[in-house]
Amino acid sequence: MPSDGRECVSIHIGQAGAQIGNACWELYCIEHGLDEAGFLKEEEKNKKQQSLQAFFSESMNGKHVPRAIYVDLEPTVLDEIRNGVYGNLFHPDQIINGKEDAANNYARGHYTIGKELIDVVLDRIRKQTENCEGLQGFLVFHSFGGGTGSGFSSLLMERLSVEFGKKSKLEFSVYPAPQVSTSVVEPYNSILTTHTTLELSDCSFMVDNEAIYDLCRQKLHVERPSYSNLNRLIAQVVSSITASLRFDGALNVDLNEFQTNLVPYPRIHFPLATYAPVISADRAHHEPLSVQDITHMCFEKANQMVKCDPSAGKYMAVCLLYRGDVVPKDVNAAISSVKAKRGINFVDWCPTGFKVGINYQAPITVEGGDLAKVHRAVCMLSNTTAIAEAWARLDHKFDLMYSKRAFVHWFVGEGMEEGEFMEARDDLAALEKDYAEVSRDTADLEEENDEF
């Protein structure tokens, strides 16, 4: 089957990356009619197969293998994949683990333990890319807070930039939640990894566990959400973002278009993701949702994947990715009604700011999952200055610990220089300033320039 040369290689790093990866590949297989081993199901064989090639390579015997690499510095999570339902989907070479973990320590992931694994990982990634006709880029899944997710990811991004200079690198990052913390040193790891990858990543979609946890509890009525509930919801967002590479649509968006439309300045590349409708299976029949309904839902704080307040910031760009039973006329009407609403503010140098994608493939859900099957859904990616609030929160936590030099010896003991902490923190202070700068009105800036 000829490829149209829009392949993407997914790289899943650490526990968060691997477990989100599981949820994504489970969903992709269902969307494309593949069984657990990657073969087309009988009823799918006569249908026209849409561009599976972007995410799967096909072997001689008709097996579809994900273009993906899983990496963790210790084996537990990856062993679960090897022995799990989709264990046969991947070639053993695609799943790579070390012997000891990064112990929540950026320096272990980036310097000591990570160094031992990086060449093997790059070699396997190279093999994946040699199998592509026209590689579009890489999707990197990881968390900011873990040692592997932060340290190894930034090491890998550095090496990918050297080896595949011009290829897009998009990140899906789990940002530390405001209230729920998985480790004390999350603020250190997050700020160190953000500093290292800030100049290397083209676009970084952030999700935070607390926001998704609340979505599962409040909208899906799951009393005690587990990581698998959270990850299935994240997978729907990832699927919406990548659907245009995998299916036909009226207005398709490829990887480079995301950057062009969402990233006004290279450093300001952290769009906020919102997905609608998030409704549970038992409520779906009572709520037929129009294009206008789901579009308005995207602008509600409760549907966001990161805790921040968009009404306190300004939008620089908005990308609306619809899928299912949606026609452009309805979308235009919905956008007009959104623009008329108060409390949705755009920066004055980018007054229009809406990019739309429509994909005819209806949203598909996992059997026995929490989400209802619906006829249409939308994923909104918005670059808003409000996300600066998330950085400010993190910087504050960093400052509290660093003022006492708490836990710093663990990092320095793994070969890091203490100077790196301040260098990273200064870079994030500059990032906060960048956000403040773009949200100021052009008129104010012109007045200041006149004074000089």
From Swiss-Prot:
GO annotation (BP), single: mitotic cell cycle
Keywords annotated in UniProt: Cytoplasm, Cytoskeleton, GTP-binding, Hydrolase, Magnesium, Metal-binding, Microtubule, Nucleotide-binding
Gene Ontology CC: cytoplasm; microtubule
Nucleotide-binding keyword on record: yes
Gene giving rise to this polypeptide: tba-8
Primary location group: cytoplasm
Residues at the catalytic site: 257
GO MF annotation terms: GTP binding; hydrolase activity; metal ion binding; structural constituent of cytoskeleton
Protein role: Tubulin is the major constituent of microtubules, a cylinder consisting of laterally associated linear protofilaments composed of alpha- and beta-tubulin heterodimers. Microtubules grow by the addition of GTP-tubulin dimers to the microtubule end, where a stabilizing cap forms. Below the cap, tubulin dimers are in GDP-bound state, owing to GTPase activity of alpha-tubulin.
Cofactor(s) in the UniProt record: Mg(2+)
Pfam family, one: Tubulin
Residues reported in the UniProt entry to bind Mg(2+): 74
Subunit organization: Dimer of alpha and beta chains. A typical microtubule is a hollow water-filled tube with an outer diameter of 25 nm and an inner diameter of 15 nM. Alpha-beta heterodimers associate head-to-tail to form protofilaments running lengthwise along the microtubule wall with the beta-tubulin subunit facing the microtubule plus end conferring a structural polarity. Microtubules usually have 13 protofilaments but different protofilament numbers can be found in some organisms and specialized cells.
InterPro entries on file: Alpha_tubulin, Tub_FtsZ_C, Tubulin, Tubulin/FtsZ-like_C, Tubulin/FtsZ_2-layer-sand-dom, Tubulin/FtsZ_GTPase_sf, Tubulin_C, Tubulin_CS
Enzyme type, top EC level: hydrolase
Name this protein carries in UniProt: Tubulin alpha-8 chain
Family: Belongs to the tubulin family.
Compartments, record wording: Cytoplasm, Cytoskeleton
EC number(s) from the headed UniProt entry: 3.6.5.-
SUPFAM superfamilies listed in its UniProt record: Tubulin C-terminal domain-like, Tubulin nucleotide-binding domain-like
Binding annotation for GTP: 15, 74, 143, 147-148, 182, 209, 231
Catalytic activity: GTP + H2O = GDP + phosphate + H(+)
